């Protein structure tokens, strides 16, 4: 640029313009601005000029970083085509909704340009996109003081919010959590009161990942109760399980010797393994995965009360309960890893849950074998008869 701001192109014989190597990176501002030799130039017309120092937007780098990661030590070229063809396209991209109109746009442009140049074989950089929702929380704004209050400085009376210091009624809105609005939550305080696992479970359970999540302390308390119930039922009943039964031989269960209650709890277990697996793998709906484990816990509680506590047991009951304990702990491990590892040790294991294989299910054991036949007379229900599915007319 000249002193009037007019733009001049660099002479072709001077290309490429190389950046100086003696720059000191202080962490403040634009490093090239500190190089007088690079910044100050003489224009072709003999006038003084100033060279552009904003030379590389970060999007230029981030638009192909996924390719460089595959060959980060290559000093001869950005990446080997063989590596790019082997690993791309990226299976899963996770980012905020703003990425759809910014980074993704630039990355696709770069990738398609690289394809045209013969440097990559794939036409698209990413297979699948997940845009996570925002975490929302109540903000408290003072019209008089023109500032946002921290929740700890607010008193709630009959659904209205007031400043503890001045008594002024505050304007309440549910908004994206941010420092500027003082409506964030301190993870350390949450962990101190409820523990890390309840915080994780609540965050994952409260909403699908692509939806907004409204922070709710009552939800945290619910997650805390759920984890405690799971811990208590397993720690109180693991002695009942057959310690020698294991996944190597499908726990040695003879399906023909199961009681009706045995059959029901095993069916619910295999349905839950299927539901959790599909919820995680297919659409990242961790909330429905956790909900499925909660349902299983209810059935486990009923089974414990009606079978274990009444000592109405058989050899198959003990084997099935061992399968239930093993698999429910592994199912909850991604969401509550600390409590899962504690329970894993309680039932006699010496490894960590993350070292174990993901539990499997048998499709046949997930099927319903009973149904209710409803008897209606003149449009009114008179009787409901339980019957096996497939019963001949």
Q: For each predicted feature, which ranges?
A:
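Hydrophobic alpha-helical transmembrane segments of multi-pass small-molecule transporters/permeases
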Residues: 92-96, 186-189, 327
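Glycine-rich, small/acidic residue-mixed loop/short-helix segments
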Residues: 387-393
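Amphipathic alpha-helical transducer elements in NTP-driven molecular machines
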Residues: 184, 224-227, 393
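Helix-rich, typically C-terminal accessory recognition domains appended to large enzymatic cores
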Residues: 1-3, 105, 109, 119-123, ...
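Hydrophobic/anchoring residues in structured secondary elements
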Residues: 131, 386-387
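Cys/His-rich finger/ribbon microdomains and the adjacent scaffold used
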Residues: 1-96, 104-107, 112-182, 269-270, ...
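Short secondary-structure boundary/capping segments
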Residues: 142-149, 184, 217-219, 346-350
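Conserved, non-catalytic sequence blocks in retroelement Pol enzymes and Pol-derived host proteins
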Residues: 96-99, 282-283
